[in-house]
């Protein structure tokens, strides 16, 4: 049978994190990241087959070159795990802001790209970088299915009293000023995993999840749906970070 290989990309303003999954076994075939895109001292770091960290320094002027570098490492004789990068049959992208347009992950087409561009006012550092990753993969493997996974999507189930601010209603209608929340993919995963470990049904629990990374947020989840979260219009709100 075919072994499906899926690449997951998280493109930031000057970084790209990547993982390659074997979807048959669920295992991670390769993982790493690029830092300092367009800056002096740019490098790619990866975890090799023995779990050792390897750093390769190289000039990386932009995201396109960064993704080309990642694909060349994936097919490299020493560090690689695939013979040809065309073995990758789908790509998932973290997209930070889906606004009110997206309540789930979606297959990317031109309409989706246009909507992500519209949401760029709300995430000017992240959304344009996320799209650079999409365009780079399309240029390298034309026609490859690409999926956008939104940080905000999980929180679209919040009731209006949780997402509305105490501001003139026109600001919401005209400019989309409301609580959106972030880290949704993480909160959804953590809440489901907690229920798995506890052996309880996900659909009838009340759960508080905490995402603690460089940024931090907490979410209230009732019956499998996000009902409130600490981040707001932007990721700056909420917990001290």
Where does each model-flagged region fall?
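Gly/Ser/Thr-rich active-site cleft segment
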Residues: 93, 110, 123-190
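A structured beta-alpha segment of the ubiquitous adenosine-cofactor-binding alpha/beta core
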Residues: 52-84
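Glycine-rich phosphate-binding loop of actin/hexokinase-like ATP-binding domains
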Residues: 156-241
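Short, small-residue-biased leader/transition segments that mark boundaries at the very start
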Residues: 1-4
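Short beta-strand-loop/turn "lid" adjacent to the catalytic site in phosphate-handling enzymes
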Residues: 74, 78-126, 147, 153-162
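Short glycine-aspartate micro-motif
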Residues: 6-8, 90-92, 147, 207-211
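Short glycine-rich, Thr/Ser-proximal phosphate-binding strand/loop in the N-terminal lobe
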Residues: 15-61
């Amino acid at each position: 049978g075919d072994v499906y290989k899926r690449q997951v990309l998280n493109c930031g303003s000057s970084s790209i994190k990547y993982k390659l999954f074997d979807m048959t076994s669920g295992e991670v075939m390769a993982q790493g990241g690029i830092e300092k895109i367009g800056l002096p001292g740019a490098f790619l770091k990866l975890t090799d087959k023995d779990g050792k960290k390897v750093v390769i320094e190289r000039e990386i002027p932009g995201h396109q070159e960064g993704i080309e570098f990642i694909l060349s490492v994936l097919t490299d004789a020493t560090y690689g795990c695939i013979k040809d990068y065309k073995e990758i049959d789908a790509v998932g992208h973290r997209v930070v802001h889906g606004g009110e347009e997206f309540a789930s992950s979606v297959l990317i087409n031109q309409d989706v790209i246009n909507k992500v561009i519209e949401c760029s006012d709300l995430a000017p550092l992240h959304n344009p970088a996320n799209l650079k990753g999409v365009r780079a993969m399309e240029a390298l493997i034309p026609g490859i299915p690409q999926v956008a996974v939104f940080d905000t999507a999980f929180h679209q189930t919040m009731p209006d009293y949780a997402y509305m601010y105490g501001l003139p209603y026109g600001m919401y209608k005209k400019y989309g000023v409301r609580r959106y929340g972030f880290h949704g993919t993480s909160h959804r995963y953590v809440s489901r995993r907690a229920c798995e470990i506890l052996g309880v049904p996900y659909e009838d629990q009340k759960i508080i999840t905490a995402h603690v990374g460089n940024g931090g947020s907490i979410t209230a989840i009732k019956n499998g749906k996000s009902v409130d979260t600490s981040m707001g219009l932007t990721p700056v709100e909420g917990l001290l970070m």
